[in-house]
Amino acid sequence: MAAAGVTAGAWRYWPEQGFWNPCRARLPRRLASHELVARAWEGLDSTQVWDCHAHLIGTGDSGSGIVLNAHMDSWLSPVQYARRLFFLNAGCAHEAHEGVDRVYVERMHNLIDGMRPGFKLVLYAFERAHDERGMPDPEHSDVYVPDAYAERVAKADPQYFEWVASIHPYRADAVHALERAKRGGARGVKWLPSAMNIDPASARCDSFYRALSRLDLPLISHAGLERAVLGRGAHDYGNPLRLRRALDAGVRVVIAHCASMGEDRDLDKGPNGPYVESFALFARLMREPSYERLLFGDTAGMTQLNRAGPALSRVIEEEAWHSRLLNGSDYPLPA
């Protein structure tokens, strides 16, 4: 009886199309012509509509430099292996026996062609985890997507893509790499602190923050619980309050997903402060007048089952925040 109850309760969360992405060429007509879709585009200049949070994934089979952790290709690590399959299926590259990098990019072309003219995706590079000495830690890096590859893909199809760099601030060449990314047209820098082993509140980030401010590049940093990419698993580094150091240095900060999942310590009440919802800490930062022109959030993934809820309702209802929210999908995760 208990098992039946659990099954019945879970059924309401079962996706209509199942858990495997059917990889349709375009949005079905009944959805593309739906009244809500038409209203969403109403009054918008589609050339100004970007998906500001999209991940560039592959296997490195094109010479891209992408590296997947060996555990993601081994049945001996079933969770990691399944994660790889889900990511590739989400990007419709799961059946590509060769040319996975190419097929993944072609799928994004296909999806953009189904949008309004001028729409773009902002593609993210993804840095390795690094140790405290600033050296790469491949054993604890789930995926590595080089800046050079993200730049190359974006520049090959500028009508489709922009790109964002990913640079670990502990690297000896971090500022130099940031300056190089700026010259290459990067629109910002992406961090996933818990996976990459970055403490945003560390003084080791100060020179990087000064460079970000000088170059007028935003920092897009994940905050709150992370489940898709584990890496070093340093969850405390995803606390939204740890980004105060960047904000106080004059850096524009985009808190990815509006920190809409998980709990973190309330560091404003001391290092051993109580755990509260990560989103509540994001909301606190958004209320601070000194951060009004510096702090933003993105909506990436917030409509997904694991995030949809009170946080999504709040960002919709909080009209004062709307001019500080960036549109994002967290592609390919929605697929």
What function would you assign to each model-found segment?
Residues 18, 26-32, 261-335:
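H/E-rich (His + Asp/Glu) clusters that bind or coordinate divalent metals
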Residues 50-54, 121-123, 162-165, 189-191, ...:
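Hydrophobic faces of well-ordered beta-strands that scaffold small-molecule active sites
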Residues 9-124, 130-141:
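An N-terminally biased module of ancient metal coordination in phosphate/nucleic-acid-related enzymes
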Residues 53-57, 168, 194-195, 224-226, ...:
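Catalytic metal-binding/acid-base residues of hydrolase active sites
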Residues 26, 32, 120, 125-236:
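Active-site gating/metal-coordination segments in enzymes
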Residues 1-5:
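N-terminal export leaders
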Residues 111-119, 150-161, 248-252, 285-295:
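A structural motif corresponding to the C-terminal end of an alpha-helix
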Residues 172-182, 200-206, 231-245, 264-288, ...:
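Distinct, well-ordered alpha-helical segments
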